[in-house]
């Protein structure tokens, strides 16, 4: 009777928890003697834990079962005899452990619809996050070797990424214009402290850029000279055409002047050979007078 009074004093005032505890019929269960190994395993659990099994996954959505392991004599000996209810406190917490997992209760017992249950589960993301953290911690304790492989892989990836960034920083340290315009002495002074392979690679890049620039300058000069020669050729061809036209014009004028000269020469020759007709008649007239 005293134990019943103590249990009634320690039970919460929530009617849901009281109704859930009253539904249990503990008389139909038989007393089972636990082996010493299981008893020691149960005592290894932390004092505030509610379950000896891993926390349920979000897929199952089933809370962990309470631990009914009997307390060890050493644990009972440390209880203050003036407060006997303190020894029954963990057992009572195991009995109404469902009060802390209200979102796992069957929705039909609360006259809730499945939609209300889904909304209740969605409305508690923080609690599910703690479940995941606990499960991850349990997995980390069971399989400590699994954490070594990802960490080693992350270290290798970080080392490769750092090495690659080192190469990129060295190659991007100088622009193409700086590499081409910089003298060899200045470049050697800037490359102190770097590895030999990186220096050789950068000098090969500089040599390639210089050869490319020299080839481009030669090509540009050739193209520019060809344009100049083509322009001069066009100008000379136009001048030749103009001179040809001038020659043809001068030839026509020469022919014209030649014809005029021939006509004038023929007229003067005919006037010299034939005497004038008016002189003999005048002489005859003078003679008759």
Swiss-Prot record:
One Pfam family from the record: Maf_N
Bias type Basic residues, positions: 152-164
Q: Which gene encodes it?
A: mafa
Q: Where is the composition biased (Low complexity)?
A: 52-73
Kindly provide the name given to this protein in its UniProt entry.
Transcription factor MafA
Q: Please classify the protein's predominant subcellular localization into one broad category.
A: nucleus
Localization recorded for this chain is: Nucleus
Named from the GO MF annotations, one term is: DNA-binding transcription factor activity
């Amino acid at each position: 009777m005293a134990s019943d009074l103590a249990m009634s004093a320690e039970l919460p005032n929530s009617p849901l928890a009281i109704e859930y505890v009253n539904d249990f019929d503990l008389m139909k269960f038989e007393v089972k003697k636990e082996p010493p190994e299981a008893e020691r395993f149960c005592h290894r659990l932390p004092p505030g834990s509610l379950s000896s099994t891993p926390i349920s996954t979000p897929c199952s959505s089933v809370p962990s079962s309470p631990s009914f392991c009997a307390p060890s004599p050493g644990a009972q000996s440390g209880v203050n005899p003036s407060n006997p209810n303190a020894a029954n406190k963990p057992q009572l917490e195991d009995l109404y452990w469902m009060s802390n997992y209200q979102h796992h209760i069957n929705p039909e017992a609360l006259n809730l619809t499945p939609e209300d249950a889904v909304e209740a589960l969605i409305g508690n993301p923080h609690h599910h996050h703690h479940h995941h953290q606990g499960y991850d911690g349990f997995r980390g304790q069971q399989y400590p070797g699994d954490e070594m492989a990802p960490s080693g892989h992350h270290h290798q990836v970080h080392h490769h990424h750092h090495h690659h960034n080192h190469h990129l920083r060295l190659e991007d340290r100088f622009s193409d214009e700086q590499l081409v315009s910089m003298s060899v002495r200045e470049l050697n002074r800037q490359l102190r402290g770097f590895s030999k392979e990186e220096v050789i690679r950068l000098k090969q890049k500089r040599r390639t850029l210089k050869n490319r620039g020299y080839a481009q300058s030669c090509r540009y000069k050739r193209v520019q000279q060809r344009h100049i020669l083509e322009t001069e050729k066009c100008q000379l061809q136009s001048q030749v055409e103009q001179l040809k036209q001038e020659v043809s014009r001068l030839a026509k004028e020469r022919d014209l002047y030649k014809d005029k000269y021939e006509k004038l020469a023929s007229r003067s020759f005919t006037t010299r050979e034939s005497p004038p007709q008016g002189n003999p008649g005048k002489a005859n007239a003078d003679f008759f007078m």
